[in-house]
Amino acid sequence: MIFFISDLHLSPRSPGATRLFLQFLAGRARQAEALYILGDLFEAWIGDDDIDDPYHAEIIAALRDASAAGLVISLQHGNRDFLLGTDFAAATGIRLLSDPYVLSTAEWQFVLSHGDALCLDDAAYMAFRNQVRNPEWQAALLAKPLAERRAIAAHMRQVSESSQQGKENPYTDLQAAATDDFLREHGYATFIHGHTHQPAKHDHIVDGIHVERWVLADWHEDRGECLVWDGEALTREALTLKNRP
């Protein structure tokens, strides 16, 4: 089995989602051969030199334990944790994936992405994305002291939350034409992505070919979800918090 998750947005402000993820890693996830995290594991990541923060250390240890137990964990960057780097990968035993990434199994082919690169109708967001994905901008940010980066991240979160107020769903969907081009470019593979917080299965017809697009669910304080590939079909599996022993 292969599991796919995204948009957990873990932070000290989300203890329920954090505990759910830790339970998932210690339990259900280990029944899979591989776990793919398609962006925004963290609400914010300000650099791998913040790896020893007690909150981060607990999650890193859980990822490392799951990796050591034989679970192959792969991660793509999201729009919140784009600074996750090689030190984080080494500490956890995971591998960082390019975006997009083509996953070929014995039975099927998938193309994986966080998904935000196709939200072309949101000009403000695309300008933000182009800025924060720029290597020179990232290097300049990482050169700042850790405390200053924390303050910048807090300010960015505040601005983001203010811009989302009053919106039923602040996330713009993928642009239809760009999505069809993407599916064509990647050989009509089944497309799995996150980012939009609008879980659904979409059926595209591209050049007369039926292509499925699966949108992963975002996680909440009391529930999450993973998409499961069992070698024959994709199914959604609800995840809920277990009572403490």
Predicted regions and their residues:
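Active-site neighborhood of phospho(di)ester-bond hydrolases with catalytic His/Asp-centered motifs
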Residues: I5-S6, L35-G39, V72-N79, L97, ...
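Active-site-proximal loop/helix segment associated with metal-binding centers of metalloenzymes
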Residues: G115-Q175
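Conserved beta-sheet core of the metallophosphoesterase superfamily
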Residues: A91-S98, Q109, D116, D121-A127, ...
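A short, polar/proline- and glycine-enriched secondary-structure boundary/capping micro-motif
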Residues: P15, D121-A124, P245
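Extreme N-terminal starter segment of soluble prokaryotic enzymes
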Residues: M1-F3
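Short histidine/acidic/glycine/proline-rich micro-motifs that form metal-
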Residues: L8-S11, L118
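Core catalytic region of metal-dependent phosphoesterases/phosphodiesterases
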Residues: L10-T105
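Short, solvent-exposed aromatic-acidic interface loops
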Residues: E237-P245
